[in-house]
Amino acid sequence: LNMDVLCAFENTTDYKVLREYINATQGYLSEINVPLSQDIDNQDYYELRSNLFARLAYDVLKSHFKKEFGAVIRKFILNVSLYNIYQYHVFRRSAFDGKLFSDLFGDDAYDLYERIFQFDGGAYTLQQRALYKSHRRDFKGAFEDIDKAISINGSNFSIKNSHAIILFEANKDKRTPISEESIAEAMDTLRKCFSSDKRKVYHAQKFAEFAIYLAKNWKDSSYLEEAKKWLAQLIDTQESNSSFTKYL
């Protein structure tokens, strides 16, 4: 958090008012021993020191305060220039998450992505908008966006992974020769991502998730052993000890 973001979010330059917001927030967090500290090198920046709290807060807000959480995100996007966000090049990689926007806003996030696109029309924005459209079953729009993202940054494994996800989701509910070819292409893309990317966990998890779906719904168990082998490898090498990996 920095003062420029707070000024824009609250639409005020009154330092006294902003200071009251910060003090109140620090007071709430101190009650649960979670510090919101000023940056040593720049006193206008504040950092939440607990990643665990941030993850738990995210889950609670999404599950129990969806309306309020959505209102804050919408206000942030409409009021705050992305140019004011500290380390935006890092922020954008996971910001504006397509699944989160689908869960919070339903079909009403298209305008938010248009707003974001005014500032950043890059591959990561296109990737998340494509995933959002996929969650809304707008597969035509999803493919248009993910293909554009690939044309911008075709070597990015995360974007390739997203293309595989969209391709799978668009074809999993129908059993035709074309859909079978598309499913095979999606699984092969994930296989290549797992083989070539140093960050293997998400590729393996998605491959396993899709393998289970195909076994249950298509009676096609041909991918299960491969998925099991990958997950065992990740657990054995301690690349992933997550409960989701072990659950799969």
Residue ranges and their predicted role:
Residues L1, F244-Y247:
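Short, intrinsically disordered, charge-balanced linker/junction segments flanking boundaries
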Residues N2-K140, A149, N161:
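C-terminal leucine-rich, beta-strand-based interaction scaffolds used for sensing/assembly
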Residues S63-K67, S94-G106, A130-G141, F168-A184, ...:
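Short coil/turn connectors between adjacent alpha-helices in alpha-solenoid helical repeat scaffolds
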Residues V72-I77, F105-F117, K140-S151, P177-S195, ...:
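Alpha-helical repeat scaffolds
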Residues G121-G122, G154-N156, K160, K198-K200:
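Short helix-capping/linker turns of helical repeat alpha-solenoids
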Residues T125, I159, V201-H203, S243-T245:
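TPR alpha-solenoid repeat register
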Residues Q128, S162-E169, K206-Y213, Y247-L248:
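"A position-specific structural signal for the A-helix of alpha-solenoid helical repeats
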